[in-house]
């Protein structure tokens, strides 16, 4: 069972009253950030305003209702009090010309006014500086500052701050490095497979420190790098209690096709990132998680928080939504943990857990915008052909299409594997029945191979006519524990209209996938089934909760 870090939770399962009518915009997620209208892709500058207690997300945007990627590309802007309900504020940064773009970048809180852009009239917690790629004839790195808490920006009159005469250097991510007392930028030299590391005292003058080159899974190009320091949940000693993580996005070239994020664990000394090994580790093994970015200026108890674009460049421009395209993933909390990777080895792994509660919402209940409206729980159920779990949130025809499930189960028969025996059980997410038809997402666990199979096949014409949508995906999982009864596994999932986020074994593996039911259908019921005369799975704990806006 996924257990959220202390910062995050009051019941993880608090979350939305009558979410939008299922007959209108039925594919729009309700607890994931989406644009009010137009196109959205990479998350850009993201920060927490500690004074106003407000979360800011900028994103690649074109508000044109055609809802496809096209210039001019702007920075759209949304804010939230609780990371689940978002207010849209239009464009915050725009290019000089309509055939150009303000490409991806980041935002920092320049609390000590190292840039010299601010005076005492601007609160230190609201000294906002954006660092971005200006995409004109070349790609140059530029900066802008805000005097109104991040709602608009003034471009630096001596831009660019970095110009290497390249059309393929972009996506600067900037952070403050205490140990070397300087700003650090990681930026992609995309088609040379380089992450370039720069340092600056003032966000204006930058010196190249080192290059992280040709590491991991290359794909076609590197994009959207990131760098942060994370605590280790279960350190092996008192000496090493944290590690640095460098992140990369690659597109195209994912093993599943299109877009994916990978990460490296190591050390950073203010000049060079030193990876612990050469292994390729993927952040999220689904099809719809790209261009991850972390928040700047989070509270210490909030830890490292971030989100990603929940789509894939293979089909992002053609998904069947109305007047808008794309959503972000849920905000996730990030740590590191030693986990078993197979029966004989263990290693540090990125742990991801969705954020439903922050320091402020724990202190002030009125900030919460979500609640549980229906719930179902079962414990110690021996699953077989005659015993199953079934829930239906559409009995009053007012289902929200948003629910979560939290499952812990034990494989009690470890000697299975004969061809005449069932070795699988399934979790099924059903739509309501419309015009005599129902659609289903399938999550099947095979005990013989300890593998989850996910099938997001629907009858929507978009999916039927999109050969690159990759409807069937699988992942091996190692047991999370062993008891006298058998091997233990966990799975936490969030279903939100057209997006499914899965967190296996307490968040050591994450998988994000979109799906598109047709004819106004939304997810309304959840079922657990095993077609076996003999029980080999015990559901230790299962909770399913339907969520709605207050």
From Swiss-Prot:
EC number of the protein: 3.2.1.26
Residue positions of the active site: 42
GO cellular component, as recorded: extracellular region; fungal-type vacuole
Pfam families: Glyco_hydro_32C, Glyco_hydro_32N
Swiss-Prot/TrEMBL catalytic activity: Hydrolysis of terminal non-reducing beta-D-fructofuranoside residues in beta-D-fructofuranosides
Signal peptide from the UniProt entry: 1-22
GO molecular function: sucrose alpha-glucosidase activity
One example of a Gene Ontology biological process annotation: sucrose catabolic process
Keyword line: Glycoprotein, Glycosidase, Hydrolase, Signal
Residues annotated as binding substrate: 39-42, 60, 103-104, 170-171, 223, 313
Disulphide connectivity of cysteines: none
Glycosylation sites: 112-113, 119, 165, 211, 237, 333, 364, 398, 420
Family membership: Belongs to the glycosyl hydrolase 32 family.
UniProt-recorded name of the protein: Invertase
